[in-house]
Amino acid sequence: MDGKYERHPESHYLDFRIDGRSLLELSDIGGTYAKDVITKFSAPDSEDAPHFRDELAGRTSPAHPELGVPLYTCAIDGDELCGFLAALIEVHDDTVTWSRIAWCSPDWDGPTGGGEIAMSVTDTGLAPMVFDRDQYEHALAEAVPRVDDLPFDVTEFRGKRFLWPWEWGWRV
């Protein structure tokens, strides 16, 4: 809510298209979560796009390697505790494989250890996807610059709210 107005920010993002279809559509999770999740190749997350590219390319490890790389996260704030669609990514000499594509969500009633929240994993049933490594890396290289060209209205996304001085974005 922004005053008396409820906001529904528009989030533009680059989607994963496999044989012309969205991964959300293929995973059958799209019907439930399609409006609620986006990739990190998005206008609100443009500063995270290079790191996301590196996770997808296998150059950096995801925060939770046992769950895989989060492909889609919350459209509002990118918080993984809202749930996310993830895949285990294996990079080989000539191919890149996405396996165990699953919806991961917090198990608020599950056991916790060391302050961590347990995550429940719901497999989508998708077969592993194998990509040609050269084509895959070419697509990732093109993605980051394209994110900067996506439309983004900061006021619409954040709302007309008071910003604390540390949120002004000034650099000293």
Task: Tell what function each PLM region has.
Residues 1-172:
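Intrinsically disordered, low-complexity acidic regions enriched in Pro/Ser/Thr
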